[in-house]
Structures are given as C-alpha cells and as structure tokens.
C-alpha cells in the first residue's frame, strides 16, 4: 500500500517509504541542524541560504535521525546494522521450504465421472455460463474473457434466484488518499508469493520464525495440495477439516462444530488447516466456502490463535476471479478449486477444449491470479501477501 510512515521512540526519529514510492516524502537539512520532512515542498518558509541538503526518500528506503548522537543515518547504514545482528540468511536456508521442492506422494488425485462432475456442479450452483464461458475461456486463453462495461444483473439481495455468497460482496477501489497502481506497467513490484505456516512474533528475532512454506501461486493444483497434505517436515503439522454437514443439520450448528474441530486440532499442534468440502454427496452439503473461511477467521481472532495457523481451502465452489479474491481477503492463504479443474478435464474430454489438461489448468490458474492482481491493484496493493485479511470487498446493500 502507498504509505510514508514516520516513527519515533523519543531518542530516534525516522521515516520509511512504501516499495512503490508513490507517496512523496521530501526533506531538507539546514545549517542549524534542523531536518524538515513532508510530502510536499514549501510547507514551511525556509531561507534557501540555510539549506545544506535537499533529498527525497526513495522507494522502500528509510531515513533515521539519532538525536542523542546528533547524526542522520542513511538507509544503507541502517539496514546493514540490523541485517548483521542475526544470521538471517542461514535461518532461511535451513528453515524455508519451497512447495516446488516437496516430493509428490504416491497417491492418486480423486477424479469424477462426467455424471458425478455434473452433480457436483449443480450442488455448488454452477451455471451454463460459469462452465462454458468463464472456465472455458480462462483455460483456453489464460486470461479472463473480455466483456462490455456495466453490470445489468440485479444485485444478489434482490435476485429471485439463489446466488452464491460471493455475489453479496462488491469490490472496493482506491480513492483520493490511496491511489490505484498499474499492475501491468509496474509488474516489477507485484508479487504472487505467499508464505504458509505459523506467523512468528515480530518483536522476537528467532530462527523458528523462518519455518515457513513458500508458495509461488496461491491458486493450487490438485498435485500442489496433495504435496502439502502429505508433507513430513519438522515444524509443520497439517490437519484436514471438513466443511460439510448432514443435510438435516442446521447451518448454525455446522459452523459451531467446525469451530470445535479447529480448536481441537490446534491443541494437538496443527498449524496448517485444510478446509475441504470434497465430502459433498446426496446426504451432505457444504458450508458456503466464504462463510466457513471468514467465520473461522473471526473465531481464531477472538480466541487469539489466528497467527498460529494458516488456512488453505479445498473447495468446489470458487470458479470466478471475484470468488478467489474475496476468499483471500477474508482469511484463506491458498485455494484449490478442484471442481473448476475437474470441469476443465471434462471440457477436454467433450472436445470443447483442445488442449493438454495440465497446460489448461495452468492457464486457468494464471488467468485467476492475474485477475486477482488486477483487483488488488485497484486498491493500490501490489502483493498477494498484502491482500490477505484486509477485506477489499464489502457487502452490497439494496439502496
């Protein structure tokens, strides 16, 4: 996000600029040892003859004034001091795990027949347009389909048809103080990398804080998720939590039971939770994935366990870019849209898509992640990691 942050502890004062450098921060140093920093030049009347230095904060750079020592510390000196306090490089080399380096387990990924796939699509509310227009287009072209501007469909709260929970949220966009960025021209500062695991204490410099799983794309293939489910690495414990419930049970009780199950696995040491609705059948229905993720997010915040775990979603419900962006914004750190991927398989088998299955899935995932970056950039956000938990969508209201 665009920001110029000033800070002080009484002895030192400093400023830091965001990585994009889109928030101006200019400063003067005068011959009577004053430093004046502001977003604009000319906020104070200063005799030009007293100015000994004019400079600006550069993207991602810091400035520190030590009032005790009476000196200005530049970005390079400041970062070198703190970078050498602990062997951060060694900690990362020995603790950071790459998803691409995990072994593929000798297990089969579940597959569905054409009839089973159709039944699941009906259970998760897929429409003809979802499959033949949205999913097919993204798998074929590696990008979202182009459509005319404007939205003439009724908002979900006024629709006479059942709408997915995602439809009750609309995307926000940056205004005035937080300008959007151009994610295409400024691709150099965008990042889709996320880190999965226990968030360490920012105030404690410990090697355990580096025990994380690095994932380059939060939209996971079935193989990616299979690798995570079966990873055997010290410091990581994975637990699968079903987000389905018996059809005669109330949704409220199902959510309460979900919270109880999550509390139990956390007590047993789990720090990666995989919420899955693969158990959907004629007797079991799925908790709406956005409700499960956001409800669990708030529950973990209330119980002060949120930073202890990471949430990964394995769901058949998300298929549009807006669905994924909303899930990431409300608590999920990675998503496996298994039914969307399975729909691609059956499009190929039906000769509606002439492409290798794995290439088509990669193109679909690429289209989704580029769409998410586009949504994030409207809010001035350049990294997917920064998108997590910030609620860049808000509920629609019928007025």
Predicted regions and their residues:
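Feature captures the catalytic cores and cofactor-binding loops of soluble hydro-lyases/lyases
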Residues: 25-35, 40-41, 46-50, 168, ...
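Flexible loop/turn segments at secondary-structure boundaries
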Residues: 12-15, 22-25, 43-46, 64, ...
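Glycine-rich phosphate/ribose-binding loops and adjacent secondary-structure elements
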Residues: 1-4, 15, 236-369, 375-378
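Conserved catalytic micro-motifs used in adenylation/nucleotidyl-transfer and phosphoryl/amide-
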Residues: 1-36
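Extended, highly charged accessory segments
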Residues: 16-18, 51, 71-244, 250-257, ...
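Acidic, glycine-rich flexible loop/linker segments
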Residues: 33-36, 40-61, 66-86, 323-328, ...
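Flexible, glycine/charged-enriched surface loops at secondary-structure junctions
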Residues: 179-186, 269-275, 375-387
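Single conserved hydrophobic/aromatic residue that forms the stacking wall/gate
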Residues: 390-399
């Amino acid at each position: 996000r665009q920001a110029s942050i000033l800070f002080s502890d009484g002895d030192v004062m400093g400023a830091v600029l965001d990585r994009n450098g889109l928030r101006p921060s200019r400063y003067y140093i005068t011959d009577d040892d004053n430093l004046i920093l502001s977003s604009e030049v000319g906020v104070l009347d200063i005799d030009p003859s007293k100015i000994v230095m004019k400079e600006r904060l550069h993207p991602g750079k810091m400035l520190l004034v030590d009032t005790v020592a009476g000196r200005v510390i530049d970005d390079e000196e400041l970062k070198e001091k703190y970078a050498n306090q602990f062997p951060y490089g060694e900690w990362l080399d020995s603790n950071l795990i790459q998803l691409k380096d995990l072994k593929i387990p000798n297990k089969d990924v579940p597959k569905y027949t054409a009839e089973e796939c159709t039944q699941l699509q009906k259970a998760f509310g897929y429409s003809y347009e979802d499959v033949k227009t949205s999913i097919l287009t993204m798998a074929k072209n590696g990008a979202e389909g182009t459509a005319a501007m404007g939205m003439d469909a009724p908002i979900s709260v006024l629709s006479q048809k059942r709408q997915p929970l995602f439809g009750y949220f609309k995307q926000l966009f940056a205004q005035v103080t937080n300008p959007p960025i151009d994610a295409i021209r400024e691709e150099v500062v965008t990042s889709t990398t996320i880190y999965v695991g226990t968030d360490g204490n920012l105030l404690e410099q410990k090697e355990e804080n580096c025990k994380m799983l690095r994932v380059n794309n939060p939209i996971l293939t079935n193989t990616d998720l299979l690798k995570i489910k079966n990873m055997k690495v010290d410091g990581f414990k994975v637990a699968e939590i079903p987000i389905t419930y018996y059809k005669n049970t109330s949704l409220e009780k199902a959510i309460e039971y979900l919270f109880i199950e999550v509390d139990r696995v956390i007590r047993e040491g789990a720090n990666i939770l995989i919420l899955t609705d693969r158990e959907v059948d004629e007797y079991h229905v799925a908790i709406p994935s956005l409700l499960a993720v956001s409800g669990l997010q708030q529950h973990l915040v209330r119980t002060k366990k949120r930073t202890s775990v990471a949430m990964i979603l394995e769901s058949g419900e998300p298929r549009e870019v807006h669905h994924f962006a909303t899930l990431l914004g409300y608590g999920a750190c990675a998503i496996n849209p298994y039914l969307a991927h399975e729909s691609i398989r059956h499009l190929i088998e039906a000769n509606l898509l002439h492409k290798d299955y794995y290439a088509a899935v990669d193109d679909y995932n690429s289209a989704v992640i580029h769409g998410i970056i586009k949504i994030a950039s409207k809010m001035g956000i350049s990294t997917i990691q920064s998108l997590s938990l910030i609620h860049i969508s808000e509920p629609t209201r019928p007025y």
